[in-house]
């Protein structure tokens, strides 16, 4: 693999170049790893072929026939040694295959591009070119971009008109021009609109959220308006409206509560008003059961029957329209008190029960439990 693509910054990391060493010497370091160190005495010039053109007698790139450009580059130079100021038409100069004459190949789009000094896309770079050596340099640059730096989709290169080009394009000036264009291509930022989705950085996803920004703004505006309106009109926050606004249930709809707390040592029963004020609160110890006698099923059953009888004495069975039974713990008194409510003792309270809930406390982690008691 020639290089590893970093999708966050779209740059080459740990790349192994396949370009000539003299061209690699002029490239800037890319990514977080620098290019390998090369000898500094290597001059920069386009790669030359073994045989020069029979007309212009210059050794140039089109004679090499690279593998990637084999259907495009011919064996001899097609420039016909035109004068320096002659506008070149690449679509007429190069003989393209039949399947690539419809403009699909990048080289066919360079013939009618407008002349300008502004930065432009690579596909509109070759409006007019100087003769053979500069053309070799530009073609080499195009091959470098397409073959080895394919993650840059539309590199922008600043070109200049032919009037400011040197009169004689030597190998040294051609190399400097190629290096300058190459540096500008990698120094300019690659905008998200010019890159595919898979090369965008994760920090450039704001454009995808623009579609929902209007609805989010409307939601925030309505929420702010409601809060400001409540603060501006304090009369709405009094009385029953306050309970409605903060989500509290009306106390008139709250039922009475019949709490049964049973653990392995005792059983507690508490009857409360809707506002949580206690009416009756008794345990097995209040009935005369001492020590270990408080944990048995019979003591809990007697406690339940006593509490129900006391509720009848207080005429609570006529006052209570709604009652909630709240169970807590898994001791033997749990089933005993339920038997009382379902039996003959609780026949006058059974019809007022509207809800049965369990309030047993469960630890998720929590404090450390007591060590188990072991006898013997």
Swiss-Prot record:
GO cellular component terms listed in the entry, alphabetical order: mitochondrial small ribosomal subunit
Key words of the record: Mitochondrion, Ribonucleoprotein, Ribosomal protein
Disulfide bridge map: none
Keyword match Mitochondrion: yes
GO biological process: translation
GO molecular function list: structural constituent of ribosome
Main location class: mitochondrion
Gene3D superfamilies recorded: Ribosomal protein S11
Subcellular location: Mitochondrion
Subunit: Component of the mitochondrial small ribosomal subunit (mt-SSU). Mature N.crassa 74S mitochondrial ribosomes consist of a small (37S) and a large (54S) subunit. The 37S small subunit contains a 16S ribosomal RNA (16S mt-rRNA) and 32 different proteins. The 54S large subunit contains a 23S rRNA (23S mt-rRNA) and 42 different proteins.
Function (record text): Component of the mitochondrial ribosome (mitoribosome), a dedicated translation machinery responsible for the synthesis of mitochondrial genome-encoded proteins, including at least some of the essential transmembrane subunits of the mitochondrial respiratory chain. The mitoribosomes are attached to the mitochondrial inner membrane and translation products are cotranslationally integrated into the membrane.
PANTHER family for this protein: 40S RIBOSOMAL PROTEIN S14/30S RIBOSOMAL PROTEIN S11
Family, per entry: Belongs to the universal ribosomal protein uS11 family.
Protein name: Small ribosomal subunit protein uS11m
Species of origin: Neurospora crassa (strain ATCC 24698 / 74-OR23-1A / CBS 708.71 / DSM 1257 / FGSC 987)
